[in-house]
Curated annotation (Swiss-Prot):
Cleaved signal peptide residues: none
GO molecular function, one term: glutaminase activity
Organism: Rhodopirellula baltica (strain DSM 10527 / NCIMB 13988 / SH1)
Biological function: Small subunit of the glutamine-dependent carbamoyl phosphate synthetase (CPSase). CPSase catalyzes the formation of carbamoyl phosphate from the ammonia moiety of glutamine, carbonate, and phosphate donated by ATP, constituting the first step of 2 biosynthetic pathways, one leading to arginine and/or urea and the other to pyrimidine nucleotides. The small subunit (glutamine amidotransferase) binds and cleaves glutamine to supply the large subunit with the substrate ammonia.
Lineage: Bacteria, Pseudomonadati, Planctomycetota, Planctomycetia, Pirellulales
Protein name in the entry: Carbamoyl phosphate synthase small chain
Gene: carA
Keyword match Ribosomal protein: no
An example Gene Ontology CC term for this record: cytoplasm
Length: 389
């Protein structure tokens, strides 16, 4: 029996460039900022990372879907990205954990995708011209119409995308990491207690958090409570936390004034650790400014220099904005730098010890070079709680 021909799909950029390919996943039309990710694997974690809200994600590696989709590697309840762009989907998915194909998962989540285009040419254009607005469609295949829609679509600057992905109520988190990673962490931390009410209590401000973050915190023996990203400092302090974690999330940190206020009021009262958007929000709360990168940092192979130790970490990153060196407040010390473009990749508050990094130490997916940052936070939590690890 012959299979039916693949349905056509088109991707149009605001500069007038149009790419024609085949439909992948759900049919329909979607707009967003066209960006690229250089990871070879980890597409499931990328699909379920809320930080990609409002973005059409292009994978630079040409073959996707070869190990399928499973229910274990999800980083949130569903997908958040605007659309998915690849060169080719593997016709076979083979892995002992695989529960379905990439295209079937995209279809079940209502994600519009495109395959069969020259992703190398697309990425070179984004790299040269910068990330730009685009429209991906299987229903409207008229080039002029699509380009007009791309030009009329909203960008990321000035939009509060966190409101679209953060939880609506608090949650007690109990899930841990897989057994192998737990053994690795506890051996390094010499800490084997889990669930004891005397253990440190971490409140996570969820701006679009990946689930591997609370898994890391929980697997170190902490009690973990997740609150919406718009929670006030008063509400958080009423929970009697021993530390506050500022999560990753999508988009521009500047319009999140509710978060700036809460973080500013928390500084000095409890230990604070932030990553990705949380890094930017901590910096802005201290008086720093941010700016939009030309095409962002997205991938699992970004080199970062630890200025204190001189060591280089290979990190997983996903952000389109960065903290500006110009006008950095005196209270903040730069601790890490991205070796690709020398942008700020980590800061520490000189007076309170609060710290944050622009990358993802939880490594889902990605290298494990930066797990030590969770241990550093744990030391602060234990000291605050009076626990001897």
């Amino acid at each position: 029996m012959m299979s039916s021909p693949a349905k056509a799909a088109k991707l149009a950029l605001e500069d007038g460039t149009v790419y024609t390919g085949t439909s992948l996943g759900a049919e329909g039309e979607t707009t967003g900022e066209v960006v690229f990710n250089t990871s070879m694997t980890g597409y499931q974690e990328i699909l379920t990372d809320p930080s990609y809200r409002g973005q059409l994600v292009t994978m630079t590696y040409p073959e996707m879907g070869n190990y399928g989709i499973n229910s274990i590697d999800l980083e949130n309840r569903g997908t958040s990205l605007a659309g998915f762009i690849i060169r080719n989907e593997s016709r076979m998915h083979s892995n002992y954990r695989s529960e379905g194909s990439l295209s079937d998962y995209l279809n079940s989540q209502g994600v519009v995708g495109i395959a069969g285009i020259d992703t190398r040419a697309l990425v070179r254009r984004i790299r040269s011209e910068g990330a730009m607005r685009g429209v991906l469609s299987t229903t409207d295949l008229d080039d002029a119409s699509l380009v007009a829609k791309a030009k009329a679509s909203p960008g990321l600057v000035g939009r509060d995308l966190v409101q679209e992905v953060m939880p609506t109520q608090l949650e007690k988190w109990t899930n841990e990491l897989d057994d192998w990673t737990i053994r690795e962490i506890r051996e390094a931390a010499k800490d084997a207690s889990i669930g004891d009410d005397s253990r440190p209590h971490v409140v996570c401000m969820d701006f679009g958090m990946k689930w591997n973050i609370p898994r890391h915190l929980r697997s170190r023996g902490n009690r973990v409570t997740i609150v919406p990203g718009n929670a006030s400092a008063d509400d958080i302090l009423k929970m009697d936390p021993d530390g506050v974690f500022l999560s990753n999330g999508p988009g521009d940190p500047e319009p999140l004034t509710y978060a700036h206020k809460a973080i500013g009021e928390l500084l000095g009262q409890v230990p604070v650790f932030g990553i990705c958007l949380g890094h930017q929000l901590l910096s802005v709360a201290c008086g720093a400014k941010t700016f939009k990168l030309k095409f962002g940092h997205r991938g699992a192979n970004q080199p970062v220099l630890d200025l204190e130790t001189g060591k280089v970490e290979i990190t997983s990153q996903n952000h389109g904005f960065a903290v500006d060196d110009q006008g950095l407040p005196d209270c903040l010390e730069v601790t890490h730098r991205n070796l690709n473009d020398d942008t700020i990749a980590g800061v520490r508050h000189k007076d309170t010890g609060a710290f944050a990094v622009q990358y993802h130490p939880e490594a889902a997916a990605g290298p494990h070079d930066s797990h030590y940052l969770f241990s550093r936070f744990q030391e602060q939590l234990n000291e605050k709680c009076g626990v001897t690890a």
